[in-house]
Amino acid sequence: MTRVRRGYTARRRRIKIRLFASTFRGAHSRLTRTTTQQKMRALVSSHRDRGRQKRDFRRLWITRINAVTRDNGVFHSYSKFIHNLYKRQLLLNRKILAQIAIENKNCLYMISNKISQIKEII
């Protein structure tokens, strides 16, 4: 069997890993073994946090909507506000509601007043 000289292939693989880990600090960007370990760890963290990011943003939107609805006084809680939105078939998602709550509170107050007026009629 002939001998395989792996110089170019191995170097190219290490350079690719080094470029990925170039922003890491200390030995994590210089030593081959630690860079490969850190690359694996970084990829695992990014995969995990993509799922976590969705949960965190949903929690943030709910907190913002809840703060404004409690300020308003029409609905005493977020859950009642969302329940009445669904009952009236006003399908606004939480992201849009949170954006309205921050940028234009009066618009959210108008929505909540409209829901409460419909409730009184029924």
From Swiss-Prot:
One GO cellular component term noted in the UniProt record for this chain: ribosome
Major place of residence: plastid
Protein keywords: Chloroplast, Plastid, Ribonucleoprotein, Ribosomal protein, RNA-binding, rRNA-binding
SUPFAM superfamilies from the UniProt entry: Ribosomal protein L20 (SSF74731)
Gene Ontology molecular function: rRNA binding; structural constituent of ribosome
Locations listed in the record: Plastid, Chloroplast
InterPro entries for this protein: Ribosomal_bL20, RIBOSOMAL_L20_CS, Ribosomal_protein_bL20_C
One GO term of the biological process aspect: ribosomal large subunit assembly
CDD domains: Ribosomal_L20
Family recorded in the similarity comment: Belongs to the bacterial ribosomal protein bL20 family.
Biological role: Binds directly to 23S ribosomal RNA and is necessary for the in vitro assembly process of the 50S ribosomal subunit. It is not involved in the protein synthesizing functions of that subunit.
Annotated protein name in UniProt: Large ribosomal subunit protein bL20c
Native source organism of the sequence: Dioscorea elephantipes (Elephant's foot yam)
Name of the gene: rpl20
